[in-house]
């Protein structure tokens, strides 16, 4: 887990995207390259990456952190995208958000040469997006070694319901 200083760089927006939600925005971290480098270092040293073949990053903020980790560890990165964003043969699943419903897709061809994956995202709230990606990978006969996130909303206790290890850098 990272320092309290990093958690202060996360901006919070009350009643966004809907009333009752306090949105945690990781984008201000990108304005602090030294802290961002430390964050990526912390995320990259997690045990869950040791036995993984590749990374699946979740649309869209997960791409930022997944790309940096992919480059640091020299591991391939596959993207899980929102509807209508990927060509080719896809695996698609729906999931529930704190504030609605959506779906994600992964290209079948992108994962065919790899067996084990770490899922990377910016934030763990209810666990819906991580489970969605997990279900797509399992449907394809793949393994999940864990989930790596920048921020975890600890009060929602999503990690208790996820069937794989969770590594978080900041817990609110």
UniProtKB/Swiss-Prot annotation:
InterPro entries: Ade_phspho_trans (IPR005764), PRibTrfase_dom (IPR000836), PRTase-like (IPR029057), UPRTase/APRTase (IPR050054). The keyword Chloroplast does not apply. It is an enzyme of class 2 (transferase). GO terms for molecular function: adenine binding; adenine phosphoribosyltransferase activity; AMP binding. Coiled coil: none annotated. One of its GO terms (biological process) is purine ribonucleoside salvage. It catalyses: AMP + diphosphate = 5-phospho-alpha-D-ribose 1-diphosphate + adenine. Pathway: Purine metabolism; AMP biosynthesis via salvage pathway; AMP from adenine: step 1/1. Pfam families: Pribosyltran. Keywords: Cytoplasm, Glycosyltransferase, Purine salvage, Transferase. The keyword Membrane does not apply. It is found in: Cytoplasm. GO terms for cellular component: cytoplasm. NCBIfam families: PRK02304.1-5. Belongs to the purine/pyrimidine phosphoribosyltransferase family. This is Adenine phosphoribosyltransferase. It comes from Prochlorococcus marinus (strain MIT 9211).
């Amino acid at each position: 887990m990272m320092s309290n200083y990093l958690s202060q760089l996360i901006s919070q927006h009350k009643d966004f995207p809907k009333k009752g939600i306090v949105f945690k925005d990781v984008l201000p971290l990108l304005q602090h390259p030294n802290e961002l480098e430390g964050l990526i270092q912390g995320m990259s040293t997690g045990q869950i990456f040791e036995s993984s073949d590749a990374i699946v990053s979740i649309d869209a903020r997960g791409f930022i952190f997944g790309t940096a980790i992919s480059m640091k560890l020299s591991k391939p990165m596959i993207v899980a995208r929102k509807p209508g964003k990927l060509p080719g043969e896809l695996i698609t699943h729906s999931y529930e958000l704190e504030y609605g419903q959506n779906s994600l897709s992964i290209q079948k061809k992108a994962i065919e040469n790899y067996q084990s994956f770490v899922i990377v995202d910016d934030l763990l709230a209810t666990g819906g997006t991580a489970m969605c990606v997990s279900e797509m990978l399992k449907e394809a006969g793949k393994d999940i070694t864990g989930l790596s996130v920048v921020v975890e909303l600890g009060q929602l206790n999503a990690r208790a319901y996820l069937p794989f290890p969770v590594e978080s850098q900041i817990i609110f």
